[in-house]
Amino acid sequence: MIIDHIIKKIKLCLPIKYSEFQIHEPTFDKRDISNIKKCVESTFVSTKGCYIDSFTSKLKNITGCKKILLTSSGTSALFLALKAIDIDSCEVLLPSMTFVATANAVVNANGIPNFIDSSETSLNLCPIKLEEYLSDIAIVKNKKCINKNTGRVIKVLMVVHTYGDPVDLLSIKKITEKYCL
């Protein structure tokens, strides 16, 4: 059965004692709990406080960026990134194996999500399926990727490193360059 096959593949990606690690449940060590208590006691438990300021400062130093904007969630970060590049009424390619937040961010930023099949072995976006999809529906005009069926611009390809397994970015980069994504 396909579901058993998928579960088996997911378990192969996880640490040996996978039952000790929860994907959707937070785990906190003693230091984390101590820091959380400090935040609660300070009344800064959201998007402001000494930890936010410290982290922002460290990120500026590491990246060399003058401005850093932290968000309260990955969903918010995806939404802001998509708004910044103006995907309004454009199509966005996503892997079929992803968290709902990826597609939600696209829809909330007024984009149109299109799902590309994932690899059976890595569960990541499959470069072969991406190439097949684009060769069937895309044309490049004026350095823009256009869906010849809808007439809309395909502006973005979002990749997700499923369970921390890195996507084959080199193969995907060649494809995105070919199609001006």
Tell what function each PLM region has:
Residues 1-45:
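N-terminal "arm"/small-domain region of PLP-dependent enzymes with the aminotransferase-like
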Residues 22-24, 72, 158-160:
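Short beta-strand segments
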Residues 31, 54, 76, 100-101, ...:
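Short alpha-helical
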Residues 32, 56, 117-119:
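Acidic active-site catalytic centers that drive phospho-/nucleotidyl reactions
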Residues 45-48, 161:
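Short, flexible loop segments at the rims of nucleotide/cofactor-binding pockets, characterized by
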Residues 48-91, 105-107, 115, 139-149:
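Phosphate-binding glycine-rich loop
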Residues 87-180:
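PLP-dependent aminotransferase-like
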